[in-house]
A protein has these predicted regions:
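Glycine-enriched, solvent-exposed interface loops adjoining structured elements
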Residues: 1-96, 108-316
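Short alpha-helix capping/helix-loop boundary micro-motifs
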Residues: 99-105
Length: 316
């Protein structure tokens, strides 16, 4: 038996729209939907995809994020130093206040315009941008440091355009990681009332409680106690939002198993516009739900799979 050896089947925004309209009988074989019809269907397709976030959509939308140390504040927006990737190094020689050229252990992967955070001797974090990287062991920053920075103090950097997080839909599995010792301790994720009931939210120490507010635009993390220096980073797992269908050739932000559910679901939503009867539309909704359930069943749930031997006695 000959098979293709190929696994890269995909579809696109406009192909899904055309297939949905064909499924409805709104267009015939070989016909092209009108531009206005495509625009309206694309809008509904985006709404449908966004609504799927209610299922949590595990696995492919599950990512790891990091809150870099920030000081003198109890909360941080996801538009700030909350990232999916970062690098760290240390100051390699004592630096005086007002310096812009800093000696670091390794600046190899730094680049101009990257965000950089330097731990000051008073425990605060000084965030600015990188102006240039003269060599592999120094960096020039845009805003001079406002305190002394001793050798061994931590330095964090990341590329804002690539590494800043998209607003998480859900956040869970939080740990406080010591950047130097590379050890982690669990953080208790609390609700809104539990966090705001805390008496002294300006106290500093090892963060052990976090409340995440997924407000519109950018989410906000509230931490307790506040970071006391730059030694630790908060790690967490999160479900990111689904990507939009912006252009005709945009592919779905989901595995292949969900393509059919997406197409039939769009057909069900568009049904009334094209004169589909209530009974037929109900059938489309049933089909769409069935295909989506089957697709979800094919995706492993979050968590671990444990394998163990069968120790039952076997007769030869």
């Amino acid at each position: 038996m000959a098979t293709s050896g190929s696994y890269d089947f995909s579809t696109s925004r406009d192909t899904i729209i055309k297939d949905a309209l064909l499924y409805l009988g709104a267009i015939g074989e070989g016909e092209t939907p009108a531009a206005d019809a495509v625009t309206e269907a694309a809008r509904m397709l985006n709404m449908l995809m966004k609504s799927w976030a209610g299922d949590g959509m595990p696995i492919w939308s599950l990512k790891r994020g990091y809150i870099l140390p920030f000081t003198e504040a109890s909360s941080i927006s996801t538009s700030s130093h909350v990232v999916t990737n970062y690098d760290s190094t240390t100051i390699s020689a004592d630096e005086a206040s007002s310096q812009t050229t800093l000696s670091v252990t390794d600046s190899t992967d730094m680049a101009a315009s990257d965000q950089i955070g330097i731990e000051m001797d008073d425990g605060t974090m000084h965030y600015t941008t990188i102006s240039s990287v003269p060599d592999g062991t120094s960096v020039i920053v845009a805003t001079a440091i406002d305190d002394e920075a001793s050798s061994g103090n931590l330095v964090y950097w990341y590329t804002a355009s690539a590494d800043r997080i998209q607003r998480p839909i859900r956040v869970f599995d939080m740990q406080l990681k010591n950047e130097t010792a590379v050890t982690s301790n669990p953080i208790n994720q609390v609700g809104r009332q539990e966090y705001f009931d805390l008496s002294d939210k300006t106290s500093e120490g090892s963060t052990n409680q976090v409340y995440y507010d997924p407000e519109l635009g950018n989410g906000t993390f509230h931490v307790f106690p506040r970071f006391q220096n730059g030694d630790t980073v908060i790690e967490f797992s999160f479900h990111r939002p689904f990507q939009d269908f912006d252009a005709a050739g945009d592919e779905p932000d989901c595995p292949q198993e969900f393509y059919l559910a997406l197409t039939v679901g769009l057909a069900a939503i568009l049904g009334p516009k094209y004169g589909v009867s209530l009974k037929e539309r109900q059938q489309l909704l049933i089909e769409s739900k069935m295909y989506k359930t089957e697709a979800l069943d094919s995706i492993y749930p979050e968590g671990s799979v444990f394998l163990q031997p069968d120790n039952a006695r076997r007769e030869d």
